[in-house]
């Protein structure tokens, strides 16, 4: 996860189950990670930060929280879950370019979150899908040569927030975590 060449001179936080209670007020923050872990952290960080740049390593399907019992959700057919996720993405992200960057392949996992797309659309939030070339003293340099200057880098890789694997016949395990609207981990 942090095996990028180069050295960053600012603050580096590694996701280890923390809720965004760190001080991000007025800061330029980079969040590097997969869609599920980023979905959990982005709303809390964006509420404080002046600018947030999300470096997405992998997209995941995002479905809104449904007022349905967990056993019913666990038995939902993969095709139905994928259809709900696609409709959620289309409904919440009108910009076709951004939507294409947020669309995972059909084997991607699914995270439950109510505000990820809404937060990502805020003017001070930006999605970057170019691969990272290296860390620089003042930020993150992507392979397109752009150096994104930030004060803090948060590495957000945590597969525990992938709650289901689509198209592989997996069921939501009873111990799986779901990501809530406030970014809190909740039992399935």
PLM region spans:
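A short, basic/flexible loop-to-alpha-helix module at the beginning of a structural domain
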Residues: 13-26
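Beta1/beta-strand and adjacent pyrophosphate-binding region of the FAD-binding site
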Residues: 27-35
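N-terminal FAD-binding dinucleotide-binding subdomain shared by FAD-dependent oxidases/monooxygenases
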Residues: 1-6, 21, 34, 39-41, ...
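Extreme N-terminal leader/targeting segments of oxidoreductases
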Residues: 2-16
């Amino acid at each position: 996860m942090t095996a990028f060449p180069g050295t960053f001179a600012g603050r580096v936080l590694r996701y280890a189950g923390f809720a965004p209670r760190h001080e991000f007020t007025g800061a330029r923050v980079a969040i590097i990670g997969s869609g599920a872990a980023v979905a959990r952290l982005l709303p809390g960080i964006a509420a404080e930060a002046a600018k947030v740049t999300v470096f997405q390593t992998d997209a995941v399907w995002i479905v809104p929280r449904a007022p349905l019992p967990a056993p019913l959700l666990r038995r939902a057919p993969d095709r139905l879950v994928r259809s709900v996720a696609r409709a959620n993405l289309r409904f919440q992200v009108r910009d076709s370019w951004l939507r294409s960057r947020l669309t995972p392949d059909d084997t991607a996992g699914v995270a439950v979150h109510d505000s990820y797309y809404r937060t990502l659309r805020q003017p001070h939030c930006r999605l970057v899908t170019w691969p990272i070339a290296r860390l620089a003293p003042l930020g993150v340099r992507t392979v397109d040569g752009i150096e994104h200057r930030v004060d803090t880098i948060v590495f957000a890789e945590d597969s525990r927030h992938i709650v289901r694997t689509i198209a592989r016949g997996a069921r939501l395990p009873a111990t799986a975590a779901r990501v809530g609207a406030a970014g809190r981990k909740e039992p399935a």
